[in-house]
Amino acid sequence: MSDRLPMETTYLVHDALRRELRQLAAVATRGDGTLRGVLRGAAGWKLLRRALRVHHGAEDAALWPVLRHALAGRPYDLALLEAMEAEHTAIGSLIGAVDEALAEPSTDPVLLGDLVDALVTGVGGHLRHEEESTFPLVQAVVTAQQWERFQQVHARRIAADADRLLPWLLDGADERTATAVLAPLPAPVRRAYRERWRPAYAALDRWGPGTPVPAPAPTPVPTPTPAQAPT
């Protein structure tokens, strides 16, 4: 049976996060002592950090409360939701710890490497946990209107950084997926994506010298409305 709710873009966000986690892990395992120097100026770290905060913030604000109400009287499922919330908190704390370590010149490189490893492992495990355990609950109890509301909240949070997060999201996406994401957006936004945002993103060496950068998918503009912006 097919899913009731359209979650393709949510999976696309997860895939993009996994792509960046692989890049972050590659930087951390180079073993040449450059981790702090690379991450301090890495656009990839800033994009990963921002994408996690946008995505998790939208879930905390507009998805978990809906699930908590719908799952009242189901202690096992509520315990799963509490685990999701705890994982978000832990990931946020790890991001903060990495940033603090990057800001301190005397940070032990081993400590920084351990923090990055914990973040890569923690986010990867959270994405898997969410897809395997929480998404089926979302499909079972969240209404189409509630899901649309979550998408709108997510859209508002991403809109301010659409010039970077949209090409980041579509990096490596196939043509069908990219077309589906872009089609609902206003024409000026699609044009800005094609003519400015995607070329600027493609020119970034997101993770610094010596780190492979995935090939990207082959001034102000109107901000997309919440219903139109990607989730």
Question: Which residues fall in each region the model found?
Answer:
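Small-residue-biased structural context
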Residues: M1-T231
